[in-house]
């Protein structure tokens, strides 16, 4: 979300 890398979590 904030980092833009919460799509693989």
Swiss-Prot record:
Keyword annotations: Hormone, Secreted
Gene Ontology MF terms: hormone activity
Subcellular location: Secreted
Gene Ontology CC: extracellular region
Function summary: May control digestion processes in crustaceans.
Family label: Belongs to the gastrin/cholecystokinin family.
Full protein name: Gastrin/cholecystokinin-like peptide D1
Lineage: Eukaryota, Metazoa, Ecdysozoa, Arthropoda, Crustacea
């Amino acid at each position: 979300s904030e980092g833009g890398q919460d799509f693989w979590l």
